[in-house]
Structures are given as C-alpha cells and as structure tokens.
C-alpha cells in the first residue's frame, strides 16, 4: 500500500508562530496563562498545561502575571481588560487575523456596515466582530446576505479559513444589493493552497486521512473538501483512532493535516499506517 503525505500538512505560519511564542513564555519563571486554547489542538494545549501554562476562559481570576493571546485572537474588550489590569501581554494573534480585525475597525469608523464571512460561533470571528460597531453582521453563505438590512456602504472581510468560493458568493450577493462595496480578501493564502493540494491528493487515492483537532475549523473544512472527491475520507485527531479495516482493498492512501496539527501527531499517524501496512 502506497502512502502519500501532503507537502503542506501541519502547522501554518500563524500557528507555528503562536506555539513558539507560547512555549517560549512557558519557559520563563512567571505565572503564565493563555486566553482560550492557544490553537485548536488538544495535544498542544495539554503539553502547555504540563509546562504550567493553563488556558483560561476569561481574565476574572487574573490580577498579575503573563497572558498569552491565542492565535485566533480575542475580543477587543479582553485586550482592554488585560491592559487595565497591567498584565504582561504576549500577543500571539495570527497576523492574518489581526489584519481582518484592523479592517473591521477601520470600516466601522468610516461609516460602513460590515459583513464578516464566517462561522458566528468561532472564536476568531467573535474576536473580529468585536472591533466593529453596531453594524457588523456575520454570514455563512451568500443566501444569508439577503436577510441583512439595506446598507448604502458595505465592507466585506472573511474568516481566515473560509473558502474563496464562499467569499465570492457573499460578495456577489452584496453587489446585487447596490450601493458602495469594499472587499478585503482576508483568507489566509496557506488555507487556500492547503485545500487545493488536499483536493488534488483526494482525486489520486483510494482512501484519505485528514489529521487534526475536531474543534479545528480549517481541519474540518479540509475533511469536507476531501470527502466531496473521495468518499473514503476519515477525519482523525490521533493515530489511536485509525481503523485497519479502512485500508482493505486500498492501494493508495493520502494523508493531510490541519494548520493546527503538530508534526509529532502527523509522524505518529504515518508510523501507525506503516505498522498496518507491514501486517498486510
């Protein structure tokens, strides 16, 4: 059985940067926490906990020490609270997410109604929305644009892990409503390239494994695009979840991983597939 690992599987720039900053902060002799999980990888969060860095839901219990801002960013009022408490802030927000936050702030301040393309329940989107005024709307598709109030000036940004196709659909609907429209493509290049590579790989193989946290939006999206082309697609978080029965009658297996999946998890998955391969 041949196994092909996607070239761009694993950490993206923003996640790599955030984890590096978190582990560096963990090595200092200070009371250190992350505001929310640093990335959507339970394994990385656990490793940080073992080093004494716990994830907090809010800042209520903190009156001193270091707070690390998660890669997805946080709400503007939480940054303000950390500053008001004079906490030492390590801002590990992904630069692409930061750019989306800045665009929303600028658009709102100049009188635009803002449309954020993304998942309203995702912490990245909730953080982005907080930088705008009272005319910020989250839509998951072009259809949802039709439910929005009429606005003369519309600004559009996207959650960094959205598909370009979905952004185009939303913009198309906005254009049909008339008025002035400004669009900022805040989709991370790594996300788009990773999805295209995963699609190409899914077309070539008999079975596809997508590795990453079940709470990771970009990993779930990878699994979705792969499943559209290869029905035998399995989203797993660790090597322990692999079922040897998946590979019955399979000549070629493809493996990709989300942007928040650490290399050691990918290595364990590849090792487990190798073990199954030897037995067969």
Curated annotation (Swiss-Prot):
Task: Give the top-level enzyme category.
Answer: oxidoreductase
How cofactor binds (record note)? Answer: Binds 1 [4Fe-4S] cluster per subunit.
What cofactor does its activity depend on?
A: [4Fe-4S] cluster
Origin superkingdom: Bacteria
Q: Which GO terms describe its molecular function?
A: 4 iron, 4 sulfur cluster binding; 4-hydroxy-3-methylbut-2-enyl diphosphate reductase activity; metal ion binding
Q: Name one GO biological process term.
A: dimethylallyl diphosphate biosynthetic process
Give the pathway: Isoprenoid biosynthesis; dimethylallyl diphosphate biosynthesis; dimethylallyl diphosphate from (2E)-4-hydroxy-3-methylbutenyl diphosphate: step 1/1; Isoprenoid biosynthesis; isopentenyl diphosphate biosynthesis via DXP pathway; isopentenyl diphosphate from 1-deoxy-D-xylulose 5-phosphate: step 6/6
Positions contributing to dimethylallyl diphosphate binding: 40, 72, 122, 216, 218, 260
Alphabetical list of InterPro entries matching this protein: LytB/IspH
**Residue runs in coiled coils:** none
Instruction: Show the Pfam families listed in the entry.
Output: LYTB
Residue sites binding isopentenyl diphosphate per the record: 40, 72, 122, 216, 218, 260
Q: Which residues cross the membrane?
A: none
Which residues are listed for (2E)-4-hydroxy-3-methylbut-2-enyl diphosphate binding in this entry? 40, 72, 122, 160, 216, 218, 260
Q: Could you confirm whether the keyword Iron-sulfur appears in this record?
A: yes
| UniProt keyword Phosphoprotein present | no
Q: Which residues form the active site?
A: 124
The UniProt record gives the binding positions of [4Fe-4S] cluster as 12, 94, 188
Task: Extract the HAMAP family matched here.
Answer: IspH
Q: Which family does it belong to?
A: Belongs to the IspH family.
Q: What is the name attached to this protein's record?
A: 4-hydroxy-3-methylbut-2-enyl diphosphate reductase
